[in-house]
Amino acid sequence: MSVHKTNDAFKVLMNSAKEPIVEDIPKKYRKQSFRDNLKVYIESPESYKNVIYYDDDVVLVRDMFPKSKMHLLLMTRDPHLTHVHPLEIMMKHRSLVEKLVSYVQGDLSGLIFDEARNCLSQQLTNEALCNYIKVGFHAGPSMNNLHLHIMTLDHVSPSLKNSAHYISFTSPFFVKIDTPTSNLPTRGTLTSLFQEDLKCWRCGETFGRHFTKLKAHLQEEYDDWLDKSVSM
């Protein structure tokens, strides 16, 4: 597949963020770049119903266009770090990484599990959910404010609209929070991933570039996982 098509797929991912992030963006923010749309949550978290937790340090918000059954964003409110690239955060600001991990695994774990049950099934145990949630950054984020993705593995969602969406969360483009610094990718080197064949994250079956077939399969995989998990 040509490099031109690769670039087109990457542009699809980056341009998809132009969808509005909030339902009612205040007038003072409406003319700013779409890449700054997460800023409203950091500055005025109390104003938005999709914010489920905030304190002086972080904000936890439901992604308005989730790419899985459950898809949350955890954002630092530190003005000195919110615009730092996630790969630089992973490499040079380990204290922030550790703080975010401590929120996910500690103070916010109950909220995250409850949110997952609300989105998937109330019958799921914390143990089942713990193995079905991934946490990480995009190597090439489409939004300016640093945001950590906390999401279930299913990738079953109407907002998962194209191959680029799926690949961005199921390839090395999605950098898991526990990735060693020695294994971090170099910025700007992963765009070739967007030309690869689509592959089920769970069973490994490949679908070429047939996104519609993949989406149907992902629903089947989710249904199978859920049936087995609630029967345990």
UniProtKB/Swiss-Prot annotation:
Signal peptide: none annotated. The record marks 41 as: Interaction with DNA. It catalyses: a 5'-end adenosine-5'-diphospho-5'-2'-deoxyribonucleoside-DNA + H2O = a 5'-end 5'-phospho-2'-deoxyribonucleoside-DNA + AMP + 2 H(+); a 5'-end adenosine-5'-diphospho-5'-ribonucleoside-2'-deoxyribonucleotide-DNA + H2O = a 5'-end 5'-phospho-ribonucleoside-2'-deoxyribonucleotide-DNA + AMP + 2 H(+); a 3'-end 2'-deoxyribonucleotide-3'-diphospho-5'-guanosine-DNA + H2O = a 3'-end 2'-deoxyribonucleotide 3'-phosphate-DNA + GMP + 2 H(+). InterPro entries: HIT-like, HIT-like_sf, Znf-C2HE. Changing residue 161 to E: Nearly abolishes enzyme activity. Strongly reduced affinity for DNA. It is an enzyme of class 3 (hydrolase). Changing residue 161 to A: Strongly decreases abolishes enzyme activity. Decreased affinity for DNA. One of its GO terms (biological process) is single strand break repair. It is found in: Nucleus; Cytoplasm. The active site is at residue 147. SUPFAM superfamilies: HIT-like. Zn(2+) binds at residues 200, 203, 217, 221. Its EC number is 3.6.1.71, 3.6.1.72. GO terms for molecular function: DNA 5'-adenosine monophosphate hydrolase activity; DNA-3'-diphospho-5'-guanosine diphosphatase; double-stranded DNA binding; double-stranded RNA binding; GMP binding; guanosine binding; mismatched DNA binding; single-strand break-containing DNA binding. The keyword Transcription regulation does not apply. Changing residue 138 to A: Decreased enzyme activity. Mildly decreases affinity for DNA. GO terms for cellular component: cytosol; nucleus. Keywords: Cytoplasm, DNA damage, DNA repair, DNA-binding, Hydrolase, Metal-binding, Nucleus, Zinc. Residues 63-67, 138-149, 161-165, 209-212 are annotated as: Interaction with DNA. Changing residue 41 to A: Mildly decreased DNAppG decapping activity. DNA-binding protein involved in single-strand DNA break repair, double-strand DNA break repair and base excision repair. Resolves abortive DNA ligation intermediates formed either at base excision sites, or when DNA ligases attempt to repair non-ligatable breaks induced by reactive oxygen species. Catalyzes the release of adenylate groups covalently linked to 5'-phosphate termini, resulting in the production of 5'-phosphate termini that can be efficiently rejoined. Monomer. This is Aprataxin-like protein. It comes from Schizosaccharomyces pombe (strain 972 / ATCC 24843) (Fission yeast).
